[in-house]
UniProtKB/Swiss-Prot annotation:
Subunit structure: Heterotrimer of A, B and C subunits.
GO CC term (a single one): glutamyl-tRNA(Gln) amidotransferase complex
Reactions performed catalytically: L-glutamyl-tRNA(Gln) + L-glutamine + ATP + H2O = L-glutaminyl-tRNA(Gln) + L-glutamate + ADP + phosphate + H(+)
Identification of the protein by name: Glutamyl-tRNA(Gln) amidotransferase subunit A
Length: 494
C-alpha cells in the first residue's frame, strides 16, 4: 500500500492502463490511509468511500474490456475542496449554515472530473466560505499540517493540501480567491496552481468573491498538476465569466520543462515581494537560492518594479468583503441551509437575523460588516470605488512587467507555516499572510506555487511562486517543471 499512496498520479495512471494495478486498489489504499490518519490531520469533512469505489470499478471495467479511457488520469482518485457542489455528498463550505446541505446538481468542475473517470474520495476541510489563511475558520475544526501538527496547513484550502502531503490522495482540487490554492501548497511542499481567471468554470463553485474566485488543480508534482489542469479547464456557457479561449498546452509545457533548459526565458523578480518587514530570513534565503537555480538553468533574471503592489492588500480587503456582503445575502433561512427560530411567532426578518447570527462564524461576519460599510451610500466612492481604481493600476503594473519578462517570481508566502492559534485574534496579521499571492487575483492572471525546499530557520516547507500573464498558464508549467527537476526530490512530511 505504501508504494501506491506515495506514487505520483502520472505513474498510477500509466499502471492502470497496462493493468499493473487497478483503480480499485489505488482508491482503496487512499481510503485506508484516510481512515488511518485523518483523525490526526482532519483534512476531510466527508469521505465518499462507496461512491469512489464505484467510480474506480467503472474504470477497471473499461480497462478489462480494452476500451479507451476517458482521460490521462482515469482511475486516479482525488480530494475535492468542499466549496464545489456535488449531488451525491454534502457541500458545507466549512460553515454551519450549510451543515448537511446537498446540492441538486454537480458543479461543472465536478462533472468534468466524473467524466474523466476520476474517483472523488470526498470533500476537504476549508476556512468558512473560503475566508481565511489557515483553515482555522472552519466550523468543523482546524486541519493540521502533516509537516508539523502544531502548525497550520494554510488556507482557505488547507484540507486539500494536507490530504496531498499526508498521502491520502494523489490529486486534489482547490479554489483560489487571494492565494487559497498557492499558499497551502507552499506550506505543505505540494504544487498548486491558480489558473487564469475564467478558464476553469465557476458554475457550482459557491461564491466568496465572484471577481476573484478561481478553481484550480493541486498535486505533489508539476506534471500531475498539469494533467489535472487539462481535465478541468475549458469554456463553460453556464458560467458568464468563462473565457471562450483555447486552453494552453500545459501538459506539453510541463514535459518540455522537465528537460531542465530555460535558455531564452526571461524571469522577473518582483521588488515589492521579496524583502522588507514581515519576511522570514529562511524564506528569503530559500527564494534567493531558487532564483540562482533558475539562472543556472539558463533563465535571464532581472528585477521588476510593480509599484502599486504596495497597495494591493488594502484594495483586496475592500473589494473582497464588498463582494462577500452581496454574495452571502442569499443565505437568508428561506431557501436552503440552516433555519433558526422559525416557531411561528417570529417575523421573517427575525428568523433571518437569528439564522445568520447562529450560522456564520466570526470571520465571515467581520467581512460582511466591512463590505456592507464599504458599499454604503456615503462611503462607496471613498472606499470601494478607490479600491477598484487601485486594482486597475495593479493590472497595469503587471502588463508593463510582462513587456520585458516572460514570468515573474516571488516567495509564495512571507513566512513558513505559523502555529495554530497564533493569528486567530489578530486579523491584520492573518491578512498580511496573503501579501504575495493576492495581486494575481486582482489582475486575473495565473500563478503557481512549487516547493523550493525547507527553511533553514525551522525546517518547514517554503514555496516559490511563479506568475504569468492571462492565458499564458503554460509558462508556469515550463518554468515550474524545470525548477522541480533541478531542485530534486524533497523529504516527505510523513
Amino acid at each position: 500500500m505504501t508504494d501506491i499512496i506515495r506514487s505520483d498520479a502520472a505513474t498510477l495512471a500509466a499502471k492502470i492502463a497496462i493493468k499493473e494495478v487497478s483503480s480499485t486498489e489505488i482508491t482503496r489504499a487512499c481510503l485506508d490511509q484516510i481512515e488511518a490518519t485523518d483523525e490526526t490531520y482532519h483534512a476531510f469533512l466527508h469521505v465518499a468511500a462507496d461512491e469512489a469505489l464505484a467510480a474506480a470499478a467503472a474504470v477497471d471495467k473499461q480497462v478489462a474490456a480494452g476500451e479507451p479511457l476517458p482521460s490521462a488520469l482515469a482511475g486516479v482518485p482525488l480530494a475535492l475542496k468542499d466549496v464545489f457542489t456535488t449531488s451525491d455528498m454534502p457541500t458545507t463550505c466549512g460553515s454551519k449554515i450549510l451543515e448537511g446541505w446537498r446540492s441538486p446538481y454537480d458543479a461543472t468542475l465536478t462533472a468534468r472530473l466524473r467524466a474523466a473517470g476520476i474517483p472523488i474520495l470526498g470533500k476537504t476541510n476549508m476556512d468558512e466560505f473560503a475566508m481565511g489563511s489557515s483553515t482555522e475558520n472552519s466550523a468543523y475544526g482546524p486541519t493540521r499540517n502533516p509537516w508539523n501538527l502544531d502548525r497550520v496547513p494554510g488556507g482557505s484550502g488547507g484540507g486539500s493540501a494536507a490530504a496531498l502531503a499526508a498521502f491520502q490522495a494523489p490529486l486534489a482540487i482547490g479554489s483560489d480567491t487571494g492565494g487559497s490554492i498557492r499558499q497551502p501548497a507552499a506550506l505543505t511542499a505540494t504544487v498548486g496552481v491558480k489558473p487564469t481567471y475564467g478558464t476553469v468554470s465557476r458554475y457550482g463553485l459557491v461564491a466568496c468573491a465572484s471577481s476573484l474566485d478561481q478553481g484550480g488543480p493541486c498535486a505533489r508534482t508539476v506534471l500531475d498538476t498539469a494533467l489535472l489542469h487539462q481535465v478541468i479547464a475549458g469554456h463553460d456557457p453556464r458560467d458568464s465569466t468563462s473565457v471562450d479561449a483555447e486552453v494552453p498546452d500545459v501538459v506539453g509545457a510541463a514535459r518540455a520543462g522537465a528537460v531542465g533548459d530555460l535558455r531564452g526565458v526571461r524571469v522577473g523578480v518582483v521588488r515589492q515581494l521579496h524583502g522588507g518587514e514581515g519576511y522570514q530570513p529562511g524564506v528569503l534565503a530559500s527564494f534567493e537560492a531558487a532564483v540562482e537555480q533558475l539562472t543556472a538553468l539558463g533563465a535571464e533574471v532581472s528585477e521588476v518594479d510593480c509599484p502599486h503592489f504596495d497597495h494591493a492588500l488594502a484594495a483586496y480587503y475592500l473589494i473582497l468583503p464588498s463582494e462577500v456582503s452581496s454574495n452571502l445575502a442569499r443565505f437568508d433561512a428561506m431557501r436552503y441551509g440552516l433555519r433558526v427560530g422559525d416557531d411561528g411567532t417570529r417575523s421573517a426578518e427575525e428568523v433571518m437575523a437569528m439564522t445568520r447570527a447562529a450560522g456564520f462564524g466570526p470571520e465571515v461576519k467581520r467581512r460582511i460588516m466591512i463590505g456592507t460599510y464599504a458599499l454604503s451610500a456615503g462611503y462607496y466612492d471613498a472606499y470601494y470605488n478607490q479600491a477598484q481604481k487601485v486594482r486597475t493600476l495593479i493590472a497595469r503594473d503587471l502588463d508593463a512587467a510582462y513587456r520585458s519578462v516572460d514570468v515573474l517570481v516571488s516567495p509564495t508566502t512571507p513566512t513558513t507555516a505559523f502555529r495554530l492559534g497564533e493569528k486567530v485574534d489578530d486579523p491584520l496579521a492573518m491578512y498580511l499572510f496573503d501579501l504575495c499571492t493576492l495581486p494575481l487575483n486582482l489582475a486575473g492572471h495565473c500563478g503557481m506555487s512549487v516547493p523550493s525546499g525547507l527553511s533553514p530557520d525551522d525546517g518547514l516547507p517554503v514555496g516559490l511562486q511563479i506568475m504569468a500573464p492571462a492565458l499564458a498558464d503554460d509558462r508556469l508549467y515550463r518554468v515550474g517543471a524545470a525548477y522541480e527537476a533541478a531542485r530534486g526530490p524533497l523529504l516527505s512530511a510523513i
